[in-house]
């Protein structure tokens, strides 16, 4: 038995973050072992293309906060947190083959990235960003600390964008290995003399294995290839000769399996940044859904 949370149906107008206040007044929920579960209901859009009719509704719950004696004006929290996931430290990819990285590491690395903070408290605070990069195999590590800075409340300033600059940073390299993983711990510390708010920590992994990836594989968006005989291509740049053994694709299932169509997987060589001559074609493939 649960509660219908119609307040989530309000259009968010593109805001980054929307706070919803839900009064819990029924005593049957006043238990120490109460479990909070959220279920969403997706809608199917009307579209001229049947293969667009899929689960395009996408929303996320940031955090759930319970407290007694609250009111609708109680909308701040003593927290200064990260509002985005750990970024890739590579210039072009989320992940790439270790042998390709080792052949030209300077070109592969990004010289800067951006972290995003959100101050949910009612007042500003002095904070410091730091990170620690650790090789999960051999213990090699690298530490970075930024200068202290002031972050204003979200209600006044919104999201804080913090640029991070690494000067000539490279991951350590082991010629004997064909893969490596680095744990990257991001920390935002709060000066206790400026605020009683708590800071935050997030952890990400930088993986060098045997594949290229532009993102972390989380299905956040999708698109269809229409009309018939259309195609799209993804470009991957290599530093040393390599072998393509396979590709991994996610097909988002649509209403009545409208996108259960045949397609070809094609490999082209490069022609000034665009597909050139066809070098391989795997014909008549179809999506496979779990």
Where are these regions (language model features)?
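Short coil-to-beta strand junction motifs in C2/discoidin
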Residues: 58-59, 124-129, 256-265
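Beta-sandwich/jellyroll recognition modules and their flexible linkers
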Residues: 1-116, 121-127
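Aromatic- and Gly/Pro-enriched, solvent-exposed loop/edge beta-strand patches characteristic
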Residues: 9-15, 257-290
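Activation corresponds to long, low-complexity, non-globular regions
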Residues: 70-207
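Short strand-edge motifs at loop-to-beta-strand transitions and within beta-strands
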Residues: 18-22, 160-162, 232-234
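Beta-sheet-rich sandwich/jelly-roll-like modules and their strand-loop junctions
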Residues: 185-273
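Conserved aromatic beta-strand anchor motif in extracellular beta-sandwich/beta-rich domains
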Residues: 1, 131-135, 265-269
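Short, well-structured beta-strand segments enriched in hydrophobic/aromatic residues
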Residues: 30-40, 175-187, 247, 290
């Amino acid at each position: 038995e649960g509660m219908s949370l119609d307040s989530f149906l309000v259009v968010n107008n593109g805001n980054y973050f929307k706070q919803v206040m839900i009064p819990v007044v029924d005593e049957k929920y006043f238990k120490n072992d109460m479990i909070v579960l959220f279920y969403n209901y997706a809608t199917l859009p009307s579209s001229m293309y049947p293969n667009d009719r899929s689960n395009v509704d996408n929303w996320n719950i940031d955090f759930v906060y319970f407290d007694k004696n609250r009111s609708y004006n109680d909308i701040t929290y003593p927290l200064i947190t990260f509002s985005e996931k750990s970024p890739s430290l590579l210039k072009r990819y989320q992940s790439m083959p270790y042998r390709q990285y080792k052949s030209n590491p300077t070109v592969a690395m990004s010289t800067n990235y951006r972290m995003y903070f959100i101050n949910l408290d009612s007042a500003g605070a002095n904070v410091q960003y730091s990170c620690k990069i650790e090789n999960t195999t051999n213990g090699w590590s690298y530490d970075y600390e930024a200068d202290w800075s002031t972050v204003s409340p979200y209600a006044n300033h919104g999201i804080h964008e913090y640029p991070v600059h690494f000067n000539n940073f490279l991951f350590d390299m082991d010629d004997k290995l064909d893969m490596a993983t680095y744990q990257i711990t991001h920390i935002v510390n709060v000066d206790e003399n400026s605020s009683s708010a708590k800071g935050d920590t997030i952890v990400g992994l930088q993986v060098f294995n045997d594949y290229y990836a532009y993102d972390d594989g989380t299905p956040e968006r999708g698109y269809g290839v229409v009309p018939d005989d259309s195609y799209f291509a993804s470009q991957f740049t290599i530093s040393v000769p390599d072998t393509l053994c396979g590709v991994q694709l996610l097909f988002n299932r649509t209403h009545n399996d409208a996108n259960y169509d045949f397609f070809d997987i094609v490999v082209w060589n490069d022609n000034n940044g665009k597909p050139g001559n066809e070098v391989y074609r795997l014909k008549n493939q179809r999506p496979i859904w779990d």
